[in-house]
Structure formats: structure tokens, C-alpha cells
Amino acid sequence: MPVTGRGPCGTCAPALRSTSKDTILTHSDQPRPLQSRANGPLTGKVRVPGDKSISHRALILGALAVGETRISGLLEGEDVLNTAKSMQALGASVERTGDFAWKVQGVGVAGFAQPKAALDFGNSGTGCRLVMGAVAGCPISAVFDGDASLRSRPMRRILDPLEKMGARVVSGGEGGRLPLTLQGARDPLPITYKTPVASAQIKSAVLLAGLAAPGTTTVIESEASRDHTELMLKHFGADITSTKEGQHGRRITLVGQPELHGANVVVPADPSSAAFPVVAALIAEGSDVVLSDVMTNPLRTGLFTTLREMGASIEESEVRGDAGEPMAQLRVRASKLRGVEVPPERAPSMIDEYLVLAVAASFAEGTTIMRGLQELRVKESDRLEATAEMLRVNGVKVEVSGDDLVVQGRGHVPGGGTVATHMDHRIAMSALVMGCASDQPVTVDDTAFIATSFPDFIPMMRSLGAEFS
């Protein structure tokens, strides 16, 4: 079926279907408070939704390819659905053919059509920034917009390299904030660009714009960020290479103006979503949980590395791969955790997981220091301060020192607090995980935004034994 219906921002969206008897979450303007309380061990086997990063990229590259792309395991959360709608608005055919199964008929590199209305990305910074890159290489203009949270987030770091490639920001808010109009380049220029921070979004936007440029586009990173765009570009037929640059960095080189070919993509389970049941199982005494097909790309598994350093029992089996992305079954058992120091160079591989890591650190014995978290300040909320606030209201001793987070673990969490989510899905899920093992229940002021990335989170956690009411 084509993408139809009313979405969170007045745009089109498909109806989401749940495999659970519980109602799946969809975002609304009405707050949805929820309380989480300890209810014994968590047990069972589940598959968390498809990886959000892969889902966005599969839709975008499918739209830029010639021929048909079939995607299975797509994350059907609001963020990804907004990317699907944008591809449809730009001229690609996008259809849902079954549960988590989608078909994209592409228009080719630089083949996007002029959209008739603004591209509304809701809460999705990833979708918005990647599509900016794809549009920058096309001779069209497009209005980019989103919800109040996305409108507050800076876009200048993305726009600077795109303007060097010939795109123009015709109008926009201070700091390149949404809503803005982007005029793509009629004759895009290849560039060599050194990213100011380790950011897969900056890198990906430049590479997607570079597809339409003649010659070679190069991105240099001093710290390697997640490499899903590079792997998927290769899967679709692009000539792209990645080599080591310095101690921790990468140099990525893309030959422009390829003909990408439609491909089949199997989306692995999202490690950023798996992080929540993983930590819940570690802190709820007696738990034994299995998660299937979780992506184990080493540039995404910083959380699992850190948890193992803390003493976590996380076992991998049934290792396999698809489109260059490795995946495995994870068995997680409740563990006694200890405090550790997390180095700043690990941040790019787990930037979305620090919130739930802070929950794990609260239940550990000893001090956990997480260094170099400046990127958390420009997410859906100021996640660094919001994480500290979440812990404090539940009786955890925590300190923000510059861009570092210091958590004093005492082996248990008093709980009893109400957590303000600041319209941030990961704060909501992290707080609910905390309540699975805290002494007193934890209340979350609004769970509606969980729908952006993990619409089936609440029924899935309940199926493992969590008590949310």
C-alpha cells in the first residue's frame, strides 16, 4: 500500500500495525504519563525493531537508485516513516508490502523532483539531515521543517559543507534552524571536507550530495563515526573506499555520478533500541533475556563493550551478516555491575546510549565517569543535563563536570521521582528501565515520543515481565 493517512505533523503517514495485543504507541499532542515499578525478573526472547540508521539510509538510497529496492525489517517508527514520506514527495515510489516490508522504486542519482509541499520530518534529525544532503545534489529547492524539538536543533554544521558543494540556504532561522529552504546545486562540486566533530550525519550528508558531483568527494574524520552510509553505498554499487586516518580517524573517498542499482536490504535489529531491554535485564535480579538479530557493527557497540567492562553477562551467538552489517543473538543475564571510566573516543560508537548507560551506572557499585559527551547537548534535548536530572530526582548522586557525567553508584536506586522527558524518546525509555529495578516506582511525565523510534517498546517490555501502569 502507498504511504497514506494523517501523521504527527499534519503530513501523510501509514497506519502502523502491532504484533502485540497491546496498543502500539503513536505520537499525539496529549501527554501520556506512565509509571514503572519493579516486578521481579525479566525473561523471554524478543526482537527489537529494525535499526533506525539503516532504515533511513535504505529508503534514501533506494530512492536514489535505478530500479526496485526491497527492504525487510524496516523500523516503522515515526522518524523513519517521515523519511519514507519525504522520498515519496521527491518523486520515488514507496510502498509498504507487508509487516516491516517495503518496496522503493528509485529515480536515480540527482533525479529528485520538486516537492509540492514542505518536507516535514517531525522529530527526526537524522532523516532531515541526510535528506538535506541528497537534495543538495539536485537542481531543485525544498522546504525542510519539523516539530518544535527539531526546530530548536542546529543545522549549520550540515549546511556549511553543502554550501561549499554549491547548495544555497534561501531562507531559514538563526543558526540554520528549521524551517528552512534549501536550493540544491545545478552543478554540484566535489570537495574534500574534514568534519569538525565525529558525526555520521555530517559525513553522510556530504557523501549523499557527492553522489551527484563529478570527480571525487572525500570526507576526513579525526574520530571514526558509524559507517552505515559507506557500507550501504557499496551495497548499492557506489565506488567508495575507507582507509585509516591518524590514530582513530577515517578517510572516506567517493567517486561521484555512479548509477546506483536497486538492492535487497535486510535491516538488523537496532542496538540503540536493544540497549533498553539489555540494561533492564542486567539490573532486574534473576533476569535472563534473549534478543535476536541485533546489529553488532563495531562502530555501534560501544555500550555493550562498556557494560562488559562493568561486569555484564552478554553472550553472542548465531552471528551472521547482510549488506556488510554483522548481527548476532544476544543473551543477557542479571549481573552485579561495577563503576568504570568511559573514554571520550568511545562516544561516537554509543552516543545515543549514554542515557541508559547512566541508568546501569546508577545500579553499579562505585563511580562511573563518562567523558566527552558534548554531542549530547544538541540532541532532541540537552541530554547531558536531562540525564543528570533523571538520576537526581530518583535519589542518585550525579554530577555534570564540563562535558563529563559522573555517577556515584550504590548498587541500588531509591526511585520515587517523576522524570521530565523534554519531548525526548530516549529519556522516557531510560526512566522506564530504571523503574524496573528501583526501590520505589519511577514516573515518566510523557511517553508519547517513544513512538518516534520504538513504537512497540511498552508491549515488548511487558511481554518480558515489566510492570508499566
Curated annotation (Swiss-Prot):
Biological process per Gene Ontology, one example term: chorismate biosynthetic process
Catalyses which reaction(s): 3-phosphoshikimate + phosphoenolpyruvate = 5-O-(1-carboxyvinyl)-3-phosphoshikimate + phosphate
Active site: 352
Region (Disordered): 21-45
Any one Gene Ontology molecular-function term assigned to this protein's record: 3-phosphoshikimate 1-carboxyvinyltransferase activity
Binding site for 3-phosphoshikimate: 52-53, 57, 199, 201, 352, 379
UniProt keyword Amino-acid biosynthesis, yes or no: yes
EC number: 2.5.1.19
Keyword Ubl conjugation: no
Gene3D superfamilies: Enolpyruvate transferase domain
Domain of life: Bacteria
InterPro entries in the cross-refs: Enolpyruvate_Tfrase_dom (IPR001986), Enolpyruvate_Tfrase_sf (IPR036968), EPSP_synthase (IPR006264), EPSP_synthase_CS (IPR023193), RNA3'P_cycl/enolpyr_Trfase_a/b (IPR013792)
Function noted in UniProt: Catalyzes the transfer of the enolpyruvyl moiety of phosphoenolpyruvate (PEP) to the 5-hydroxyl of shikimate-3-phosphate (S3P) to produce enolpyruvyl shikimate-3-phosphate and inorganic phosphate.
Quaternary state and interactors: Monomer.
Family designation: Belongs to the EPSP synthase family.
Protein name: 3-phosphoshikimate 1-carboxyvinyltransferase
Species of the source: Bradyrhizobium diazoefficiens (strain JCM 10833 / BCRC 13528 / IAM 13628 / NBRC 14792 / USDA 110)
